[in-house]
């Protein structure tokens, strides 16, 4: 049993007995399908439970990690010491005139579909992004010339001391794959998007077109975390990797996708170690050839295997 067993009952008091898992394999909770066990994994069902869980962790010096859909996450093979707070059950979405308000765990696809039903445009670019809205805002996710920064109005967040407050668009300070949320280690609880009225068919056709392009160009048939690397200034990561001759390069079960060099995929039976070794190999080779540093877009957490 792990060192946090003494807190199991306290977490169960907060989130309920059925929402606390012990030594939970993180490969069940990430799109890469890899990762060792988390000491505890809890799934709060209300924002108040999130706040109480964070305060319990803070007061007892328990490390904690927030995850949504696990789609931009790589957990090392040794797993996670401490508590994973998964926002899976915090997915409420409501539409108020031209605004869509969503809890942090709501999948982007669900939010896009609610906007579509209400003839609200602006989020079409996000419909194929597999993550939840909390993670999307934290990293200012984007695709096909669209970014969260273009449509967000505000975000309700919580800090490490359990204080809840609202950040407007300016305070969120959204840049390329960055935000004030990352900088100050805030956690997103709820997001308000301001959209525009549009025709149902116009929105639907745009979504279908972007999803068709994704399917044609991206290795969606394999586990991955989407684009592995951020776009280096003045370059495209996929082109640098391809021009280095690394398309199809494998280490263990991890491979640089033959369909899109910007994706590292789990071809089958990969470990987190395989993926991390391949990431480092690609970074080194691209640096040698082009003197360009590739930085990961995927979030990497957890312990190495002993």
From Swiss-Prot:
SUPFAM superfamilies, sorted: FAD-binding/transporter-associated domain-like, Uridine diphospho-N-Acetylenolpyruvylglucosamine reductase, MurB, C-terminal domain
Gene Ontology CC entries for this record: cytosol
The keyword Cytoplasm belongs to this UniProt entry's keyword annotation: yes
Keywords noted in UniProt: Cell cycle, Cell division, Cell shape, Cell wall biogenesis/degradation, Cytoplasm, FAD, Flavoprotein, NADP, Oxidoreductase, Peptidoglycan synthesis
Catalyzed reactions: UDP-N-acetyl-alpha-D-muramate + NADP(+) = UDP-N-acetyl-3-O-(1-carboxyvinyl)-alpha-D-glucosamine + NADPH + H(+)
Family: Belongs to the MurB family.
NCBIfam families, alphabetized: murB, PRK13905.1
Keyword Transcription regulation: no
Domain of life from the UniProt record: Bacteria
Task of the protein: Cell wall formation.
A matching Pfam family: FAD_binding_4
Enzyme Commission number(s): 1.3.1.98
Domain FAD-binding PCMH-type: 34-198
GO terms (BP aspect): cell division; cell wall organization; peptidoglycan biosynthetic process; regulation of cell shape
Record: active site: 177, 227 (proton donor), 297
Cofactor(s) it depends on: FAD
Gene (UniProt): murB
Record PROSITE patterns: FAD_PCMH
GO terms, molecular function: FAD binding; UDP-N-acetylmuramate dehydrogenase activity
Protein localization: Cytoplasm
PANTHER family in the record: UDP-N-ACETYLENOLPYRUVOYLGLUCOSAMINE REDUCTASE
Protein's pathway: Cell wall biogenesis; peptidoglycan biosynthesis
Enzyme class: oxidoreductase
Taxonomic placement: Bacteria, Bacillati, Bacillota, Clostridia, Eubacteriales
UniProt-recorded name of the protein: UDP-N-acetylenolpyruvoylglucosamine reductase
């Amino acid at each position: 049993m792990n060192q946090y067993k003494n807190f199991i009952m306290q977490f169960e008091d907060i989130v309920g007995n059925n929402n606390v898992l012990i030594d939970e394999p993180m490969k069940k909770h990430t799109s890469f399908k890899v990762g060792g066990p988390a000491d505890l994994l809890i799934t709060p069902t209300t924002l108040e439970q999130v706040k109480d869980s964070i305060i319990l962790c803070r007061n007892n010096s328990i490390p904690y990690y927030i995850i949504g859909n696990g789609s931009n996450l790589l957990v090392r093979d040794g797993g996670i010491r401490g508590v994973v707070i998964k926002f899976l059950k915090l997915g409420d979405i409501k539409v108020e005139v031209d605004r869509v308000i969503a809890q942090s765990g709501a999948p982007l696809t669900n939010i896009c579909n609610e906007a579509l039903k209400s003839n609200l445009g602006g989020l079409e670019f996000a419909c194929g992004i597999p993550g939840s809205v909390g993670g999307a805002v934290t990293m200012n996710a984007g695709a096909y010339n669209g970014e969260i920064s273009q449509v967000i109005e505000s975000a309700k967040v919580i800090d490490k001391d359990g204080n809840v407050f609202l950040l407007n668009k300016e305070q969120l300070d959204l840049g390329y794959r960055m935000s004030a949320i990352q900088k100050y280690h805030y956690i997103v609880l709820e997001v308000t998007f301001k959209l525009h009225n549009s025709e149902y068919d116009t929105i639907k056709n745009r979504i279908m077109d972007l999803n068709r392009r994704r399917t044609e160009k991206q290795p969606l048939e394999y586990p991955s975390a989407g684009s592995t690397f951020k776009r280096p200034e003045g370059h495209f990561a996929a082109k640098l990797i391809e021009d280095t001759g690394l398309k199809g390069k494998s280490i263990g079960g991890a491979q640089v996708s033959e369909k899109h060099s910007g994706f590292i995929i789990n071809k089958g039976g990969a470990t987190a170690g395989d993926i991390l070794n391949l990431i480092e190999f690609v970074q080194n080779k691209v640096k040698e050839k082009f003197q360009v540093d590739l930085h990961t877009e995927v979030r990497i957490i957890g312990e190495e295997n002993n």
